Amino acid sequence: MTEAQRHQILLEMLAQLGFVTVEKVVERLGISPATARRDINKLDERGKLKKVRNGAEAITQQRPRWTPMNLHQAQNHDEKVRIAKAASQLVNPGESVVINCGSTAFLLGREMCGKPVQIITNYLPLANYLIDQEHDSVIIMGGQYNKSQSITLSPQGSENSLYAGHWMFTSGKGLTAEGLYKTDMLTAMAEQKMLSVVGKLVVLVDSSKIGERAGMLFSRADQIDMLITGKNANPEILQQLEAQGVSILRV
């Protein structure tokens, strides 16, 4: 791994966590403590982070929350575009797909818009986009509106939300050899109910989330059919996932 790649991953860790220790950097990048401190010092000198005792802090900046209007500002946007394009190529004409919330989900929906596929979603920004673009087949899952996630959630135990799809595409805040993690419990529990009725589960996460644990375990690794991620993803974690039957696609 080059110095530039290490710096990129270190900054992505800070963007997600706000603070990292030297020990965490060593574990994540597989480097010596001396190299970790040297990387932190260089990025501190460039104003990219704030060096603190035994670690580093993110420089506080108000990052605008992404919307369909400023999607290009989403974190790791270019990598997410590649992931979405690769995911869209898995789906055959006439098939149905379940797409959940998030920037990668919106990018995937945008890729599929206009193709002869049925799109099932509870993510209102995506549903509104598909309707505005006159996509032929859109199913919007009903339920109570959740403002923080811009989604609808069905009551606990409701069977009305169990739409069977050939594919389910989802993402999360972290992916390890144990499985996929999500931080919003209500959203995760609503999506978990669908795992038993979809054909294949495909996880879409950028490389910064590989090896991270955050929130609750949404699905075990052996429940995941495929992972699509970036080329900088931790190879050790990918090997552990492959050993459990997960197909890996790096883009």
Curated annotation (Swiss-Prot):
Keyword Secreted: no
One GO biological process term: negative regulation of DNA-templated transcription
Record key words, sorted: Cytoplasm, DNA-binding, Repressor, Transcription, Transcription regulation
Subcellular location: Cytoplasm
Domain (HTH deoR-type) ranges: 3-58
Gene3D superfamilies per the UniProt record, alphabetical: Winged helix-like DNA-binding domain superfamily/Winged helix DNA-binding domain
GO molecular function terms noted in the UniProt entry: DNA binding; DNA-binding transcription factor activity
Start-end of DNA-binding region: 20-39
GO cellular component: cytoplasm
Function text: Represses ulaG and the ulaABCDEF operon.
HAMAP family for the chain: HTH_type_UlaR
NCBIfam families: PRK13509.1
The protein's name in its UniProt record: HTH-type transcriptional regulator UlaR
Organism: Shigella sonnei (strain Ss046)
